[in-house]
Amino acid sequence: MKKKLALILAATMMVGALAGCGGGTTSTTESDPGTSQGETASNLRVGVFYYNYADAYISTVRTAMDAELESLGVEYQNFDAQTNQATQTDQINTAITDGYNLLVVNVVENASPDAAQNVVNAAKAQNIPVIFFNRDFDVSVLESYAESCAFVGTDPAEAGHMQGQAIGEYLVANYDTVDLNGDGKISYVMFKGQEGNPEAEYRTQYGVEDANAVLEEAGKPALEFYDSSNTQKYLVDQTGAWSAQAATDYMNTILGQYNDGNNNMVELVIANNDSMAEGAISALQSVGYNVEGGDKTIPVYGVDALASAVEKIDAGIMTGSVKQDGEAMAATIATLVGNVQSGAALMDNTDQYTLATNDAGETIPNKILVPYSLYSAEG
């Protein structure tokens, strides 16, 4: 089912001075003086630290988060690390010094737990609660500050599994059409957002593995990476920004050698996110593929179900995406912020959410998972 979500802005926003290297927004709204308890709007100061404003998905989270925090009536400031962990660390340390008493952190580096642990150590020294979101890391960080630290995100493997299953089912149903050169195999390119990021690693792995499992069950050969000399079987954004431009540049280079004229056109695009999927589409359109109303289309899959990607899917330009619900993530974070504001425990009022489990199947009490859903033209 196609899901369309809307947010109603509950308060007006006053834009203040830029903060840190990336800048930010301070927003203060009046709360009902007769109902606030605990950390009210007068003394709760929330620092929200984003790894990169330019990330299209993060932009949706930020818009929704601003609305949620305004609705709560808290003072907050946004900070943009611009994919630089040192910048973010400086922003957080300065915010603590400046009196911010709740940190909401989209950590830049998560290939190891070090950056997140440093945030926790700094916050714990001042008894400041921390809410991490979106970019996952080792659970030991949460355990080190269990009563005052939480994570809101997604199951890193789920999007890869959903994407791979959808790709496999689509190919089985449309195999001869997708097999442009009629060689009985499907060639693909995989665009990876970042090295070491759990979401990127699992999406890169399962987007192909699960598709191959469906193909094998249907008696079809496994997918073949278009460039047999590439042993990694993916192309990564070297900046770690999951950017459309990286995919466009890669795809333009690919099309110079792998094309209709050489009878070896890439037949499938798999991307870790919608931005990279859309970047690949830009390059494809330059050679007449994936144009609305055109007669030459190769399947392109992404993750996030951004509004721009949904439009492309509806128009037949893109094939499918896995929705990562930015509005739901922001609303979940706002529940935790509201707990701090009212003086409740950080994880109070969360019975409606899904908690993560560890490898032993034990519940992780301060790690909330926001579910994914598939978006495709088929519904």
Residue ranges, per PLM feature:
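Beta-alpha junction/loop-to-helix N-cap segments that form part of ligand/metal-binding clefts
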Residues: 82-142, 149-156, 274-277
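Short, low-complexity disordered leader/linker segments with a strong preference
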Residues: 1-45, 70-71, 75, 118-128, ...
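Hydrophobic alpha-helical segments within soluble ligand-binding/sensing domains
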Residues: 88, 150-185, 202, 244-251, ...
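Hydrophobic alpha-helical
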Residues: 108-126, 207, 231-311
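Extracytoplasmic "Venus flytrap"
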Residues: 44-64, 68-69, 76-94, 100, ...
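Periplasmic-binding protein-like
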Residues: 48, 99-110, 129-133, 190, ...
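Flexible loop/hinge segments that line or gate small-molecule binding clefts
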Residues: 119-158, 162, 174-185, 191, ...
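Hinge/cleft segment of the Venus flytrap/periplasmic-binding protein
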Residues: 42, 182-195, 199, 211-212, ...
